[in-house]
Amino acid sequence: MDAMSSVDESSTTTDSIPARKSSSPASLLYRMGSGTSVVLDSENGVEVEVEAESRKLPSSRFKGVVPQPNGRWGAQIYEKHQRVWLGTFNEEDEAARAYDVAAHRFRGRDAVTNFKDTTFEEEVEFLNAHSKSEIVDMLRKHTYKEELDQRKRNRDGNGKETTAFALASMVVMTGFKTAELLFEKTVTPSDVGKLNRLVIPKHQAEKHFPLPLGNNNVSVKGMLLNFEDVNGKVWRFRYSYWNSSQSYVLTKGWSRFVKEKRLCAGDLISFKRSNDQDQKFFIGWKSKSGLDLETGRVMRLFGVDISLNAVVVVKETTEVLMSSLRCKKQRVL
């Protein structure tokens, strides 16, 4: 995780994000193919947000919006007296709408917002289906509307998954299975521990995830990599090079992946790439015991085969127990 980030992505609760200042130019964002965003950072691979000093800049007419020295607008919300940064936007009303989205997720339908409540049940369902940290992440990366629209396209008028969505899910799984295996890595205790980062073997990193050149042919210090899992969920990881340890690492976003997949030391992570023009990246995982956690759809509980897709609650509860026992057993040994 980035050194200056104070939102724990592996939790549904949100910590404060302190104001950060820098005299360096604002970060530049580039697109590389369909699955990569590159960030030219000002320092140490950290995206820098600058909060305006109220005594120097005029205040906004909107709640939760603060002006920035570069003419843009920042959005923020407070929870338990701690500030949560929601990102920087070109227009003042964009920042205000970002605040409204966060307010609905943090405080419910009765939250005080800048604009008249136009949140429909479908959007409420979308908000409730994601953790606070996930919504904050979408707002910061300006992907909230896109992901909400995608959710709407995948539902029919009755709120059920469309046939097109079911077919798309089959395509995702097929693409995952036929993708080219780039490399695998057995995760170490530090990879799944409190350091919140995954070290990528240097030769694999330079071969498959080379950092592009920025100004003066100097490699940029970090970029965002997108990976799809077998279920079609997109995981965004910050990928950078640490001079201190001379290693390539996945940081921001990794801790959430570890928690959701309940990874333990000794588990196997695989990285794949599609063979089509999109060149999408995929990520898979298997337990140390050899159980394929990517495709397991049925488990046997008390002598009965239970569909994990149909009984989500049983799936989540059982996986938590199994993962907890699996990790504890490794520690004892």
Curated annotation (Swiss-Prot):
InterPro entries in the cross-refs: AP2/ERF_dom, AP2/ERF_dom_sf, B3_DNA-bd, DNA-bd_dom_sf, DNA-bd_pseudobarrel_sf, LEC2-like
SUPFAM superfamilies membership: DNA-binding domain (SSF54171), DNA-binding pseudobarrel domain (SSF101936)
Compartment list: Nucleus
UniProt keywords, alphabetically: Activator, DNA-binding, Ethylene signaling pathway, Nucleus, Transcription, Transcription regulation
A GO BP entry: ethylene-activated signaling pathway
UniProt biased composition (Low complexity): 1-16
Claim: Transmembrane is one of the keywords in the record: no
GO molecular function terms attached to this record: DNA-binding transcription factor activity; transcription cis-regulatory region binding
Family membership noted in the UniProt record: Belongs to the AP2/ERF transcription factor family. RAV subfamily.
Stored PANTHER family: AP2_ERF AND B3 DOMAIN-CONTAINING TRANSCRIPTION FACTOR ARF14, B3 DOMAIN-CONTAINING TRANSCRIPTION FACTOR ABI3
GO CC entries: nucleus
Protein known as: AP2/ERF and B3 domain-containing transcription factor ARF14
Function (record text): Probably acts as a transcriptional activator. Binds to the GCC-box pathogenesis-related promoter element. May be involved in the regulation of gene expression by stress factors and by components of stress signal transduction pathways.
Annotated source species: Arabidopsis thaliana (Mouse-ear cress)
PROSITE patterns per record: AP2_ERF, B3
Top-level taxon of the source organism: Eukaryota
Residue span of region Disordered: 1-27
DNA-binding region, residues: 61-116, 183-289
